[in-house]
Amino acid sequence: MAERAGRRCCLGWDFSTQQVKVVAVDAELNVFYEDSVHFDRDLPEFGTQGGVHVHKDRLTVTSPVLMWVQALDLILEKMKASGFDFSQVLALSGAGQQHGSVYWKTGASLALSSLSPALLLHQQLQACFSVSDCPIWMDSSTTAQCHQLEAAVGGAQALSCLTGSRAYERFTGNQISKIFQKNPEAYSNSERISLVSSFAASLFLGRYSPIDYSDGSGMNLLQIQEKVWSQACLDACAPHLKEKLGSPVPSCSVVGAISSYYVQRYGFPPGCKVVAFTGDNPASLAGMRLEEGDVAVSLGTSDTLFLWLQKPMPALEGHIFCNPVDARQYMALLCFKNGSLMREKIRDESASCSWNKFSKALQSTEMGNNGNLGFYFDVMEITPEIIGCHRFNADNMEVSAFPGDVEIRALVEGQFMAKRIHAEGLGYRIMPKTKILATGGASHNKDILQVLADVFGAPVYVIDTTSSACVGSAYRAFHGLAGGTGVAFSEVVKSAPQPSLAATPNPGASQVYAALLPRYAELEQRILSKARGPLE
């Protein structure tokens, strides 16, 4: 993208699973430059597929740390070649794929702080890592370590109350624990352990960047209320871990000025600030500009809910993180596996493969579906753990089938009622000013969005989120520059492009769903108890 000279800006980076991406955002909050390096395509020598290596056991999934370093070299060289004016960059921040960890070898800090501008980063950091292939979020090889961690703190719910989530295989503490157990030498040779986000920030700083509260919440190690490492969790994972992690910081902290390497090699100004990097999900929350009481619903292959919470109630499902734009608040993530594929399956079966007919079915049926409720789980659901299709009539009797139109409304209403019930289970409450931001494939269907507005009793807006983690990182850089904790993020980003209104609740919707929601929750429990069978 062509760059206009002399445009003061902030950069937003995203070190994601498949690529490194950057955007430049000017003072009016317009994106005017973007670029990316795709790991498989642009760095084929690392032999990744989808940016990762899946190991023989099919459970272990890693990425080469030097691939990430080299990708940064490539993208900066591309920007330089395109004539990008680095001297106008006021600050930068970024995002990393969550949960992944990087292991810096003893002595690496010296190499980081004495980089020569004559050489590329990857030429100078070759010997800086004690683990060359980093565990990432797709890894599920740490079940034993998860059991050990939960047992050490008094069970899954106790761990969730402390850290915001029960033990998950991909969470960093369990991955560190596995490395300590399987490769104690690499662990003891690590002077610092970073998340992907704080690793990327360290490359820009020329010294170790602290982990931020929000991405730190995805480790099963941080006490989300007190914002300090939980000693009990650290002890359960590995010895001397506190020193290797460093102290966490608020997500909007300015962690320092950019390393002189970038000033000399690329022409960044010496005063360019680095704002703490965070996880890609928290950065997306910033990019979508969620505010208190808002919900973002990503309607994709799996459906994901992002919530802004004031008073979290950690549970055995979902994840609660410290909020990336307001350190006193929280955010939650809930994932539902049966998303668009389930909607497409019912479309094919009940609407002759036509979205048009699917929409007509939603238009021709009443809110509340005359009391008919359905649960549609083609694959084992995460929230809750149920599989199969279950249909109930207005008398709560299970039935084997619904007419096509009823089936379609039962599916869509059921999916959104489940989202509201599970969100409220984590402490979420709909407020008078609540907005729902819809993204992903199904957000183009106005009739699906109408049901979403009716079930939540709140207006639905659509927003373009193609680069939300990147753009959110640039917004966060502006926020850090403006003073971070002392300044409302919403003030800093108020001139950004507004989302567009797509649906408002129909009159009477709140009464209809006030009656249906408790019924849906009760039936869900009934199916769950039946699936689990009698207790041994």
UniProtKB/Swiss-Prot annotation:
Its EC number is 2.7.1.17. Substrate binds at residues 99, 170, 280-281. The keyword ATP-binding applies. It comes from the Eukaryota. One of its GO terms (molecular function) is D-xylulokinase activity. Monomer. PANTHER family: SUGAR KINASE, XYLULOSE KINASE. Phosphorylates D-xylulose to produce D-xylulose 5-phosphate, a molecule that may play an important role in the regulation of glucose metabolism and lipogenesis. This is Xylulose kinase. It comes from Rattus norvegicus (Rat).
